[in-house]
Amino acid sequence: MFFMEITLDQLLASREERASFQKELLKGYPGKTLVCLTVIMPGKVKRNLQSLVVAQAAVTALVSAFGDSMLKFRLRDLPTGYEAYLVTPLSNEEAKKETCRIEDTHPLGRLFDLDVIDADGVPMSRESVGLSPRKCLVCDNEARYCMRNRTHTMAELTAKIDEMIESYVR
């Protein structure tokens, strides 16, 4: 395990590569649903002991929820973070509801970024299945509002993540 800082260019390149990988999976499984996991880990170090704990918890939750219906599962350990992909015959809507249930009920679920990718490579929104947007890790505002406005300091975010993980591993 290494704790290497990544650059913005690396992060942006990893997003492009992830989108390309998702399109390849979708092409290989036409008519099926793709679920993609990334770990929410603010800062320049995306791969550390905390992100490993979160990724393992998320993978366990995904396998528990989708295990019998998984057609393919792939885990990737990259300098830009852990990623997992699963293909299921469930509808996009069924899969999105299940991933939202995991995010909303698992003790570390707020640190899971579980996307359901449609046939065009576009992630489905929570609102598309009648759910409200994700809440901020620190306060009760919408997460996207706090992210866009940089409402919380890195120290506040890190403290909250530390607290969540510490509580989970106890």
Write out the residue ranges for each language-model feature.
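Short cationic amphipathic helices and targeting signals
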Residues: 82-90
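Long, contiguous binding/interaction regions
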Residues: 2-67, 77-79, 94-170
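Short beta-strand elements
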Residues: 69-73
